[in-house]
């Protein structure tokens, strides 16, 4: 029996239609997966050894909100939102910090802390002093009384006098004490220079020209004739880390005020030494060699 040619043509037509349908479905699925199904983003580069990076940062002390350093000019300008530590310094240019990870130019805690960051990511770094600027030297820390005793008479040689008062010792001249700001009278006997401090009771003074104080009393014959001036310092804990100055060429800052103990502390170390530091860092660029 001869098969019908028309039926064969129908079967071929159905097969072609089925193939077209499969192709259409494949195209639709392809479009769906390519354009509509979210694709996993490629893993970003993360900072590692030898990468050249730039970061923005704000550095504060762990036990306070005071900013001691930053690369961000808006932070530098805003003292209300970002109060500053004594050691904070203004600079001519404000820009992200650039360095090569692991090149030794950064403190260890900062260098280690930026590793693993991708561009645009931020992180808070807690840097103990051992990974920061090292321990403080205890010999450079001086604790004194808020009601402080100062001698009326000081004796020294001419070299010491010149270094302290920035003038040659001549009997009868008046000098200004570089710490207390009051007048003192000079007398010279051979190689010995005597300086007699001459404030008056209730005199308002500004030690180191930094804070207010008052001369409480003067006993000219106390301590075997050396004499004693009692000075009451007007300090409080809100001033800690905020004020500092220079004496004999050395920088210092107010590191403690203990109203219960009646004491205050001046620290001649770097303000970042011996302290845990916080850095808010954001990775801005990353270049891998």
Role assignments for model-derived ranges:
Residues 2-289:
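FKBP-type peptidyl-prolyl cis-trans isomerases
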